[in-house]
Amino acid sequence: MKKQRNLRSMAAQAIEQVVEQGQSLSNILPPLQQKVSDKDKALLQELCFGVLRTLSQLDWLINKLMARPMTGKQRTVHYLIMVGLYQLLYTRIPPHAALAETVEGAVAIKRPQLKGLINGVLRQFQRQQDELLAEFNASDARYLHPSWLLKRLQKAYPEQWQSIVEANNQRPPMWLRVNRTHHSRDSWLALLDEAGMKGFPHADYPDAVQLETPAPVHALPGFEEGWVTVQDASAQGCMTWLAPQNGEHILDLCAAPGGKTTHILEVAPEAQVLAVDIDEQRLSRVYDNLKRLGMKATVKQGDGRYPSQWCGEQQFDRILLDAPCSATGVIRRHPDIKWLRRDRDIPELAQLQSEILDAIWSHLKSGGTLVYATCSMLPEENSLQIKAFLQRTADAELCETGTPEQPGKQNLPGAEEGDGFFYAKLIKK
């Protein structure tokens, strides 16, 4: 039996690591969840994700409720108060229980002398809640995005930025990809129905199913057998443009964690696939995904800017480049992105994308297809990136996705329930 731990203090420490140390929640959270019961795993995740989703609101409230911010060794208490405020604002946890557990969290982080302070701040919020929220809802902080990102979205999407921000602040739906080598989508939906769950097919992507209510993967029919994979609908859209065929040599570049690698092999089981990623640790997930689905691909660690180091002079029929990007299209799925990214990251990412595109183009066969994809919402990484590439690359031609003036197809977050995503299909003349 797992030792009872104070979830509020665990959440506060995890959030502090994200915000103060720039660590990714997807790296921090899983080891913490191993320390708690199955029942508590979900609550710990809700507290971490929820606080990061609403961080600017909680920060704003603390600044109103406290004369001085908590600094230095007391900084964890700042995040513990955030966890308390989040519970009072957004969860069904009875207020007395939320307060008691949060105050007790001070003991777990070895700050028992601050129990009274935490209790006082949270009770003051309860008394002033209506007037504080009215003031907050009239401020720019209500958008729950850092100002640099808000400005970029307003500039890029003058008519749509508010709906983008709103979608980013929602909980994401759970999308699945049915493995067509095992089941048709309809036959798997029937199995899902028999298991007492409901799912809905995507109108455009033939393998995509949205669950009515998110569920643990082990509850899904045939998950362990490889019948189904968790993957957002927009990410599945890459296959529409790549259209892999049996017998082709296909490169999946920046492939980890392997969702698109395995999708290529579901669509074209006899394709020869090379999956490459710069991050050796994340490549272990590519191997895991291939193993669960019973598939074979060549997997290599390598830098996309220097392809000759890992593929020599090899030429490919098709290349999928899921480029490293700001991930500003998947904020609803990874709310820590809002606080991990900086404005200065964008030109650096655009430069890296440009270098990878130029380097890999020479490894595409004449007549071959390259699909450039990102989960970004920013033109510098998307349409402007492809426009510049087309201008400097004489043998590149845009195909089916946009126009030379406005190249690519941009999915907005929440549109047809998918994530924000960009695709450009290029043909080598």
Curated annotation (Swiss-Prot):
rRNA processing found in the keyword field: yes
Keyword terms of this UniProt record: Cytoplasm, Methyltransferase, RNA-binding, rRNA processing, S-adenosyl-L-methionine, Transferase
Active site: C375 (nucleophile)
Places the protein is found: Cytoplasm
Superkingdom, natural source: Bacteria
Family listed: Belongs to the class I-like SAM-binding methyltransferase superfamily. RsmB/NOP family.
Name recorded for this polypeptide: Ribosomal RNA small subunit methyltransferase B
Lineage, highest ranks first: Bacteria, Pseudomonadati, Pseudomonadota, Gammaproteobacteria, Enterobacterales
